[in-house]
Structures are given as structure tokens and as C-alpha cells.
């Protein structure tokens, strides 16, 4: 039978579960990350997990929501009270994000993506319209967007970073990070129309 926790303990343990889950999702992948591994790392019984979350799928959605809120804080910090930033600053922010512990997509494998599509009912992750909306919001925060930018191309360029990481086993590993940096620079040039890939 799950242990009874105080309200304060519930809040603390919930936060620990989410942080451990984010870490384990990168180490093991979403598919291999079990409820037992999450609870064991936090030091609670497996059954106690269900006091906090209905299922592993519900847990993943909550972890994604938490990561999204923390990412928004990162973005506001980068804006530093302004309403917009340059394309260069946005790419700096995005580079920080994809290398932070908050990027749940970093480290996912093809198997993880198939698992997500099968088990997660909230499919904004795979919905092109939702991605276009997010991209439009991001572009509205950039003050030097060139005329004629295609939002879908912007989305696809960002997704290409994740495609490289997703297929890391078939890539030249030593060149993964330099490939990501070249893609980031390409995205910056595509947004602003300024500079070249070697600047």
C-alpha cells in the first residue's frame, strides 16, 4: 500500500519525480524509462508513483509541461525586459535550450518517437499546425526577420537538428555537435538574411 505523504512532501517528491524522469529519459529513452526506475531513483515505492500521476504517459505530459514552463523562463531571461531580440540572440537562446536539461527531445531514439506516437494522446508534438503556431510565436519575438520567410521551412530546419540526434547511431558521432552548430547558423541566416555560414 502506498505511503501517505504530507502536502509538503507531496510537492517535494512530485518535483523530484519530474526532475529524475527528465534525466532518465535522456539516459534510457522514454520507452525504457520505467515507473520502477523513476521511483527507485527518488526512493519511494513503485505504488506511490500513482499518488502523483495516473500513468507513465500522464507523467511524461507533466514533465513536458514543466520543461515548457522552465524554457519560457529561459526565454524571458534572454529577452531581459524587451519584447524582441535579434535572430542571433534567438539562436543563442535556442542553442542553450537544446543543450540544457529541459530539452526532452534531446536523446530520443526512433523507438522513443514510435512509443510517443502510440501512447501519448496529446499529439501537439507531431501536429504540423501546432508547430507552425509555435514557430510564428518565436518569429514574433525576433526583430530582424527578413521578408518572405517560410514558417514551414523554419520548422523543418529546427526539426532537422532533432533528426540528426534521433539517428545518431547512423551518423559520424565526432561531427554531431559541429553539424548541429552549422544547422543553427543556417537557421539564423535563413531568419535574418544576414551573414554566411562561416561568420
Predicted feature locations:
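Basic, helix-initiating cap at the start of DNA-binding domains
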Residues: 1-28, 37, 41
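An amphipathic alpha-helix adjacent to DNA-recognition modules
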Residues: 11-19, 31-32, 52-76, 80
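Hydrophobic/aromatic residues within well-ordered alpha-helical segments
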Residues: 13, 56, 63, 67, ...
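Solvent-exposed, amphipathic alpha-helical segments
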Residues: 20-28, 70-78, 157-168
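Short hydrophobic/aromatic patch on the recognition helix
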Residues: 43-53
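Hydrophobic alpha-helical connector segments
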Residues: 62, 76-103
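Amphipathic alpha-helical packing segments from all-alpha helical-bundle domains
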Residues: 117-159, 163, 178-181
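C-terminal peripheral helix-coil segments that are non-catalytic and often amphipathic
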Residues: 136, 140, 160, 164-199
Amino acid at each position: 500500500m502506498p505511503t501517505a505523504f504530507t502536502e509538503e512532501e507531496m510537492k517535494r517528491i512530485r518535483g523530484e519525480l519530474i526532475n529524475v524522469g527528465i534525466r532518465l529519459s535522456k539516459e534510457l529513452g522514454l520507452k525504457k524509462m520505467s515507473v520502477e526506475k523513476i521511483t527507485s531513483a527518488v526512493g519511494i515505492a513503485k505504488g506511490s508513483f500513482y499518488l502523483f500521476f495516473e500513468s507513465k504517459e500522464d507523467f511524461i505530459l507533466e514533465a513536458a509541461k514543466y520543461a515548457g514552463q522552465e524554457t519560457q523562463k529561459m526565454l524571458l531571461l534572454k529577452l531581459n525586459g524587451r519584447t524582441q531580440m535579434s535572430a542571433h540572440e534567438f539562436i543563442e537562446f535556442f542553442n542553450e535550450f537544446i543543450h540544457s536539461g529541459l530539452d526532452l527531445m534531446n536523446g530520443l531514439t526512433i523507438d522513443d518517437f514510435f512509443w510517443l506516437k502510440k501512447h501519448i494522446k496529446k499529439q501537439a508534438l507531431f501536429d504540423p499546425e501546432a508547430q507552425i503556431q509555435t514557430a510564428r510565436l518565436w518569429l514574433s519575438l525576433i526583430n530582424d526577420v527578413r521578408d518572405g520567410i517560410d514558417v514551414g521551412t523554419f520548422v523543418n530546419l529546427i526539426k532537422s537538428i532533432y533528426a540528426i540526434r534521433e539517428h545518431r547511431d547512423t551518423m559520424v558521432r565526432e561531427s554531431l555537435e559541429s553539424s548541429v552548430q552549422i544547422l543553427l547558423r543556417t537557421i539564423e541566416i535563413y531568419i535574418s538574411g544576414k551573414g554566411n555560414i562561416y561568420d
